[in-house]
């Protein structure tokens, strides 16, 4: 059986095929394409038609390789959505979570419901771009015309099959799902002026969505596909592919964002979890991904784009190695870095405000970013141990960031934990494995992780002896200084 993963991230997408051979997963990249938002009509908008076109081109390539039949699963980033009318047509283009319309919405909604009340209901961390805040800022007249609100991966599946669902791992990120009941919360829906029936029925990963409607796409020669729901939130798919064993391990799903957390059976909605802004997102097989959403490779992606010389990410890491780490302390989670006009100038301005050495060269900028990511990761690991009351012995970095040896070593040094890097294509791998579990070719997630360990090289980074406590203290003092400006 051939399985196809459609994995669309915030900056790029890829289509991978995979099959299981003697307990090992063989995967092949078939198609890769760019993704990103553009500034149009006063908003940051996604080009959904571009994504659909690329998906169809990729599926056509699958057939060109001789695969007449396959199953398909789709995952994407979280929180963003489309609004559809009764005919199933989009009422407008999908707005990106990086749009500035929700900059102050957390405070606005707090006039209706307190943070504590929302957290007890949802267990979801407070991010200005969460779906609940996007819907709060929606045009009320547009919402009245809306028949269905669909998360991006659900909408892409709908475009291929005509079947509308709301997959649970992605909708859990909206801050509208009640963590206790597993249903959309009526009070939260009312607070943002939407109705429960505007969402399609909730569904779990591993369900058959429907057959690809080839007749809708006469310009493409497509295989006969059965489309499955997978863990449609890309992080939920990636965590399936985290090669952890038993307990005592944490993960960073490292891409445009860094999601750092542990896998639990039950949510943690304590005051300490709220205070530290941790989230309880749904995972596959009724698990809870207790994690923190941290700014990730977005910052270096923006810097790379703005540098005058054409550096690869590997070259930037090599340049960073030539620079002494921990020369600047920057809170990259500050909302000023979410979508600034110029990331390089924003970093330099932060350093100027806090009277630190200003990074100017490509190597200095890269080293500054990677050093501070490592510090932020280390702080989050310590928080996880405190909140969960469990020690973390192993730390798995999965996703694109796993190939960054420089950052991986800094993370090991700052956390004092052994870092295990890989697999790199964790999200697509988890997508494929979820399809295999649904097809009963793989028994469960435990067996899926054994398949990962059998199939992919895992690189180990051991921590060096550094004065990590002093570095973290300096970071925290500088961050407090910046907040007082």
UniProtKB/Swiss-Prot annotation:
Supply one GO molecular-function term: rhamnulokinase activity
Which CDD domains does the record cross-reference, listed alphabetically?
ASKHA_NBD_FGGY_RhaB-like (cd07771)
EC number from the UniProt entry: 2.7.1.5
Q: What class of enzyme is it?
A: transferase
Cofactors demanded by this protein: Mg(2+)
Any GO BP: rhamnose catabolic process
Kindly tell me the pathway this chain contributes to. Carbohydrate degradation; L-rhamnose degradation; glycerone phosphate from L-rhamnose: step 2/3
Which family does the record assign? Belongs to the rhamnulokinase family.
This protein's name: Rhamnulokinase
Origin species, per record, is Bacillus subtilis (strain 168)
């Amino acid at each position: 059986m051939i399985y196809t993963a459609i994995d669309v991230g915030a900056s790029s997408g890829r289509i991978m095929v995979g099959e299981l051979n003697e307990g090992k997963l063989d995967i092949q990249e078939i198609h890769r394409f760019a993704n990103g938002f553009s500034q149009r009509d006063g908003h940051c908008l996604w080009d959904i038609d571009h994504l659909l076109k690329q998906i169809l081109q990729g599926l056509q390539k699958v057939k060109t390789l001789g695969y007449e039949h396959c199953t398909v699963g789709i995952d994407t980033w979280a929180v963003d959505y489309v609004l559809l009318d009764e005919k199933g047509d989009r009422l407008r283009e999908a707005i990106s979570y990086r749009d500035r319309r929700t900059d102050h919405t957390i405070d606005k909604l707090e006039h209706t419901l307190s943070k504590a009340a929302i957290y007890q209901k949802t267990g979801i961390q407070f991010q200005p771009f969460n779906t609940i805040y996007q819907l709060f800022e929606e045009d009320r007249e547009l919402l009245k015309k809306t028949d269905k609100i669909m998360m991006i991966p659900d909408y892409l599946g709908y475009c291929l099959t005509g079947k509308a669902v709301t997959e649970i791992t992605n909708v859990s990120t909206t801050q509208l799902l009640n963590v206790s009941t597993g249903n959309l919360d009526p009070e939260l829906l009312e607070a943002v002026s939407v109705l429960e029936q505007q969402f399609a029925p909730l569904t779990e990963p591993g369900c058959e969505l429907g057959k690809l409607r080839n007749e809708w796409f006469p310009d493409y020669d497509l295989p006969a596909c059965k489309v499955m729901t997978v863990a449609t939130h890309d992080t939920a798919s990636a965590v399936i592919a985290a090669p952890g064993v038993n307990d005592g391990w944490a993960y960073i799903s490292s891409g445009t964002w860094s999601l750092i957390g542990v896998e639990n059976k039950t949510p943690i909605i304590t005051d300490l979890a709220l205070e530290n802004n941790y989230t309880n997102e749904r995972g596959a097989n009724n698990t809870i991904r207790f994690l923190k959403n941290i700014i990730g490779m977005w910052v270096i992606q923006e810097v790379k784009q703005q540098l005058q010389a054409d550096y690869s990410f590997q070259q930037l890491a090599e340049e960073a190695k030539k620079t002494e780490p921990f020369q600047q302390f920057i809170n990259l989670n500050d909302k000023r870095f979410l979508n600034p006009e110029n990331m390089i100038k924003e970093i330099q301005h932060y350093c100027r405000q806090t009277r630190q050495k200003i990074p100017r060269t490509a190597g200095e900028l890269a080293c500054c970013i990677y050093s501070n990511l490592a510090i932020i990761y280390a702080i989050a690991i310590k928080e996880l141990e405190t909140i969960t009351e469990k020690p973390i012995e192993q730390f798995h970095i999965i996703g694109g960031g796993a190939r960054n040896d420089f950052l991986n070593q800094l993370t090991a040094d700052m956390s004092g934990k052994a870092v295990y890097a890989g697999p790199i294509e964790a999200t697509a791998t988890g997508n494929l494995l979820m399809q295999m579990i649904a097809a009963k070719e793989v028994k469960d997630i435990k067996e899926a992780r054994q398949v990962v360990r059998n199939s992919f090289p895992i690189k180990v980074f051991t921590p060096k002896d550094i004065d990590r406590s002093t570095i973290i203290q300096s970071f925290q003092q500088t961050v407090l200084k910046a907040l007082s400006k």
